[in-house]
């Protein structure tokens, strides 16, 4: 049991960026398939005028109020209802299951698409959003009813916006 200076361990194998490259390719392929599916839904829906948002999803207004109406800003409290459906229209969570929500804009965690969608709605408006999976619950799902990489349709109604007093 003598003193021995520590020896550096050598790596067993050299890792390349292949995992990340493969992951990126899978994501690009998934995104392309989802976009094609969403575009097909829009083409088949002649009743609604879809808007392509700057956030990377599509939506249309079920109920629209004056175009000069106030849109929520950072810290505003938004009282709203929504439901979640699969891309084929099957209800995953009903409005009654989710219940009325209060959300402090950009101060609390909700899924990305919903947070960005709420920024587009004024008090009294209702819109239907089609979110690709990366704007919904992404790879992990919601660990309950929503699985991995599932695009969603959400109908969102803003009941009230309380302006941030700060």
Please place each PLM-identified region on the residue numbering.
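Cross-family detector of peptidyl-prolyl cis-trans isomerase
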Residues: 2-166
């Amino acid at each position: 049991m003598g003193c021995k200076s520590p020896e550096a361990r050598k790596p067993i194998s050299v890792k390349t960026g292949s995992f990340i490259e493969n992951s990126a390719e899978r994501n690009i392929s998934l995104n392309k398939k989802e976009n094609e599916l969403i575009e097909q839904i829009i083409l088949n829906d002649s009743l609604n005028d879809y808007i392509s948002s700057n956030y990377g999803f599509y939506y249309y207004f079920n109920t629209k109020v004056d175009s000069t109406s106030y849109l929520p800003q950072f810290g505003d409290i938004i009282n709203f209802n929504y439901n979640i459906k699969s891309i084929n229209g099957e209800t995953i969570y009903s409005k009654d299951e989710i219940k009325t929500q209060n959300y402090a804009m950009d101060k609390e965690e909700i899924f990305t698409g919903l947070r960005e969608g709420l920024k587009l709605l004024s008090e009294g408006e209702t819109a239907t959003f089609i979110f690709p999976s990366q704007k919904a619950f992404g790879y992990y799902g919601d660990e309950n009813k929503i699985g991995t990489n599932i695009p969603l349709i959400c109908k969102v109604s803003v009941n009230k916006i309380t302006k941030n007093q700060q």
